[in-house]
């Protein structure tokens, strides 16, 4: 804020300096959809900080709902020689459903699972990447060490022999599936097929059993970064429901249904241990049946149009049917099929 005093500050007898980074700005009033990876390809230190501790307080990918930014920012911090970085800020569970604390930021494991997994990966990147090591320019530096980020896939990925983490569905195969001890996921992967929309954690115990922790499905009801957030209007809802999970690992192939909680898989048997595990009490937000849908901006003539919508209900959803009417009054009905979490999809034929 006072760049004309920077030389005097850095020349003083101080132990270190702090910096911050908001590459997408602050308080845009809406979610930012642009690709910001080029903007975080490098972090340029504008001042002479030789011989001083370098600390980041604070940083965030503000107003970005994607899950691809945090590891890239961690990479650039380490390249610039930073030794400490603090993300701003984590939303308490009771407030995350409203995002009223400071709406340009939104981070919570339950309500923003993809972003939370991305931050988990970024923490690992910051700890493991060498200070001062560069990885080239964008897009070549989208893969660095054990890590990969992708705007197109909305993905942060860590692929290591014992640790495999992904913020969204990926087809990238683990480098050593037989050695895996920890999996942190959101979406699906070659080793975990899951049709819920919450985060999950799989940890191999010393006795060979697996501890499985699963979080609720979540759906956004409005732009969480808007200027109208209030305590009487929830920007996201969570719901606990049984979902199918399939695990495909050497020595462990299993197919079962789980609801949010903690489980132990041992010798071919799944046991719920939520009560003993200290799992947080998560109250469902879904109180009535509702549909949340963002209309497509454009459709290609003659091609099938895929329509997606989130359908929530406190009761089990039996079926979802899309009713439509074309120009000049031609009506049609198309059945919608469940995908992950609350999402249902239908393809409208292009010849309608």
Model-derived features: positions:
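Structural recognition of alpha->loop->beta junctions
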Residues: 9-21, 79-85, 109-126
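Glycan-association/targeting regions that enable binding to alpha-glucans and other polysaccharides
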Residues: 276-352
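Aromatic- and carboxylate-lined catalytic core of secreted/periplasmic carbohydrate-active enzymes
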Residues: 91-221
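Glycoside hydrolase catalytic-domain groove-lining segments
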Residues: 7-63
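Substrate-recognition/cap regions that form aromatic- and gly/pro-loop-enriched pockets
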Residues: 225-251
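Non-catalytic scaffold segments within catalytic domains of secreted glycoside hydrolases
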Residues: 2-11, 21-32, 64-89
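Contiguous mid-protein beta-loop-alpha structural module that forms a pocket-lining wall or clamp
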Residues: 53, 74, 83-94, 103-105
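C-terminal beta-strand-rich structural cap/linker in extracellular carbohydrate-active enzymes
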Residues: 245-285
């Amino acid at each position: 804020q006072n760049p004309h005093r920077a030389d005097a500050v850095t020349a003083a007898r101080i132990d270190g300096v702090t910096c911050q980074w908001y590459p997408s700005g602050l308080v845009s009033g809406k979610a930012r959809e642009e690709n910001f990876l080029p903007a975080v390809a490098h972090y340029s230190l504008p001042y002479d900080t030789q011989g001083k501790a370098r600390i980041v307080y604070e940083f965030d990918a503000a107003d970005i709902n994607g899950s691809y930014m945090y590891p890239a920012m961690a990479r650039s911090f380490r390249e610039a020689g930073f030794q400490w970085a603090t993300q701003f800020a984590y939303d308490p569970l009771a407030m995350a459903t409203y995002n009223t604390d400071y709406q340009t930021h939104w981070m919570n494991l339950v309500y923003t699972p993809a972003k939370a997994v991305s931050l988990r990966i970024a923490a690992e990147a910051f700890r493991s990447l060498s200070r001062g090591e560069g990885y080239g320019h964008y897009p070549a530096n989208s893969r660095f060490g054990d890590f990969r980020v992708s705007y197109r896939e909305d993905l942060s990925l860590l692929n290591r022999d014992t640790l495999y983490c992904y913020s969204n569905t990926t087809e990238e195969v683990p480098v050593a599936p037989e050695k895996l001890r920890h999996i942190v996921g959101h979406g699906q992967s070659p080793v975990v097929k899951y049709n819920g929309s919450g985060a999950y954690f799989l940890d191999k115990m010393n006795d060979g059993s697996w501890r499985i922790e699963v979080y609720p499905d979540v759906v956004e009801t409005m732009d969480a970064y808007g200027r109208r957030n209030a305590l009487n209007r929830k920007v996201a809802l969570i719901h606990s429901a049984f979902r199918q999970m399939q695990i495909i690992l050497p020595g462990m192939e299993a197919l079962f249904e789980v609801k949010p909680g903690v489980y132990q898989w041992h010798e071919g048997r799944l046991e719920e241990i939520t009560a003993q595990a200290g799992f947080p009490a998560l109250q469902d937000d879904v109180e009535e049946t509702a549909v949340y849908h963002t209309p497509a901006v454009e459709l290609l003539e003659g091609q099938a149009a895929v329509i997606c919508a989130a359908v929530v209900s406190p009761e089990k959803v039996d079926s979802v049917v899309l009713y439509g009417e074309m120009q000049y009054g031609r009506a049609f009905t198309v059945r919608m099929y469940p995908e992950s979490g609350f999402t249902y999809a239908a393809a409208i034929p292009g010849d309608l």
